[in-house]
Amino acid sequence: MKRHLISAADLTRDDAVLILDTAEEMARVADRPIKKLPTLRGRTVVNLFFEDSTRTRISFEAAAKRLSADVINFSAKGSSVSKGESLKDTALTLEAMGADAVVIRHGASGAPYRLATSGWIDGAVVNAGDGTHEHPTQALLDAFTMRRRLVGADTGLGRDLDGRRITIVGDILHSRVARSNVHLLTTLGAHVTLVAPPTLVPVGVEKWPCDVSYSLDDVLAKSDAVMMLRVQRERMNAAYFPTEREYSRRYGLDGERMAKMPEHAIVMHPGPMVRGMEITAEVADSDRCTVVEQVANGVSIRMAVLYLLLGGSDTALSAAPARTEENK
């Protein structure tokens, strides 16, 4: 792997499979009474969040703590950033404090890249979401969830998603999750189809390594996984569709539409969900929906990323006991 994780497009197939396989090892820790490894003891991980977050911030914090790293949580609200401090000065402050890794979420696309290439800090930089650009660890946990469900947790080691057909539905225009997933899933051999109203499809999407459809019903029967995306109204300054009811009628996933999917197919959502709009309660609460699994898998994936970027102790990892009936 490279020194930083800025974009899913930076990952080769071997990089991605290594992260997924390492995450399987990390998942064993979650089955233990004491969910902790000493592998990053003495290292400092800073969660630098300029945007609100629940799942991602808590997930990174849990991941770092399970690896025994010291964690500093930084929120732009209530900090000197709210007084006008620049990203550079914030980064220099973190460097002075000895940060070994900085996990950054920022509203500006490209902020993590700037932090990683500026020379302001020496530590590893992990992109936890930048504007509408990318969210690579979300794509990794999505791929991890797909591999576990569609290939198998035990039989999936070393394998990718070759031949799997993944459909991503919703606000593609504003979705950093969609962009990262398109890059990563195609790298892993999957075939990706984007489904959205024409107004929520980005300009230049024809250059992306995926297909585009404007009809959800046309693609459900041949999908191994359907990922629903929230409409990001906070990034909109105009009307992109007539009404929420009309959007839900054409692009929402309900029980009737879910029944058109193959029996093995799964329903995914990166969260937060808006029940009744892009997904109904019936679908969200069904056994085919992996939302809760994705949250749990996110901790394992982020443990793997931090472990690999910071050169954790292989001895500590190999000391984690295998999953057995006794320690489940």
From Swiss-Prot:
One of the GO BP terms on file: 'de novo' UMP biosynthetic process
Pathway: Pyrimidine metabolism; UMP biosynthesis via de novo pathway; (S)-dihydroorotate from bicarbonate: step 2/3
Keyword Transcription regulation on entry: no
Catalytically driven reaction(s): carbamoyl phosphate + L-aspartate = N-carbamoyl-L-aspartate + phosphate + H(+)
SUPFAM superfamilies associated with the record: Aspartate/ornithine carbamoyltransferase
Binding sites annotated in the UniProt record for L-aspartate: K83, R176, R230
PROSITE patterns in UniProt: CARBAMOYLTRANSFERASE
Keywords in alphabetical order: Pyrimidine biosynthesis, Transferase
Pfam family membership, one: OTCace
Leading EC class: transferase
Superkingdom field: Bacteria
A GO cellular-component term linked to this record: cytosol
GO molecular function annotations of the record: amino acid binding; aspartate carbamoyltransferase activity
General function of this protein: Catalyzes the condensation of carbamoyl phosphate and aspartate to form carbamoyl aspartate and inorganic phosphate, the committed step in the de novo pyrimidine nucleotide biosynthesis pathway.
Assembly and oligomerization: Heterododecamer (2C3:3R2) of six catalytic PyrB chains organized as two trimers (C3), and six regulatory PyrI chains organized as three dimers (R2).
Annotated family: Belongs to the aspartate/ornithine carbamoyltransferase superfamily. ATCase family.
NCBIfam families (UniProt xref): asp_carb_tr, PRK00856.1
Listed name of the protein: Aspartate carbamoyltransferase catalytic subunit
